[in-house]
C-alpha cells in the first residue's frame, strides 16, 4: 500500500508581504503499486514563478500517469521521467508566450519521483 500527503502553504513572510505561495506539488496514484509525486519550488524573485511551479508539478505527474505502466523496463521509465521534464518546460514556455512575458519570469525547480513496487525513480531540475 502507498500512502501520500502533500500541502503547499503561504508562509508567514509571504502573508505579511502579500506574496503568493510559489511552491507547488502534485501526487498521482497511477495504480495500487505505482505513484508519481512532484514538488516544484518557484524562484521567489520571479513574478510568475508560482504559475511555473504549478505547471511543472502538474504536467510532469500527469505525463507519468499517462505513460507509466508496470510492464515497462527501468530504462523506459527513466525515459518517461526525462520526457515529463521536457513536456513541462514546453508548457511553461507556451504559457509565457501566450501572456507575452519573458520566459525568465517563470523560473522554478522540479523534483519528480515515481515509486513502482519497491523501485524508486527520481529526477530533478533546478
Where are these regions (language model features)?
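PP2C/PPM-type serine/threonine phosphatase catalytic domain
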Residues: 1-126
Amino acid at each position: 500500500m502507498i500512502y501520500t500527503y502533500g500541502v503547499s502553504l503561504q508562509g508567514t513572510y509571504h502573508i505579511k508581504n502579500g506574496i503568493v505561495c510559489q511552491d507547488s506539488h502534485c501526487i498521482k496514484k497511477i495504480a495500487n503499486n505505482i505513484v508519481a509525486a512532484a514538488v516544484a519550488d518557484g524562484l521567489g524573485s520571479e513574478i510568475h514563478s508560482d504559475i511555473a511551479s504549478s505547471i511543472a508539478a502538474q504536467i510532469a505527474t500527469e505525463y507519468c500517469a499517462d505513460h507509466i505502466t508496470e510492464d515497462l523496463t527501468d530504462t523506459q521509465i527513466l525515459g518517461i521521467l526525462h520526457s515529463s521534464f521536457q513536456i513541462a518546460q514546453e508548457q511553461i514556455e507556451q504559457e509565457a508566450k501566450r501572456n507575452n512575458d519573458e520566459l525568465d519570469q517563470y523560473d522554478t525547480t522540479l523534483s519528480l519521483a515515481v515509486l513502482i513496487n519497491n523501485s524508486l525513480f527520481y529526477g530533478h531540475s533546478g
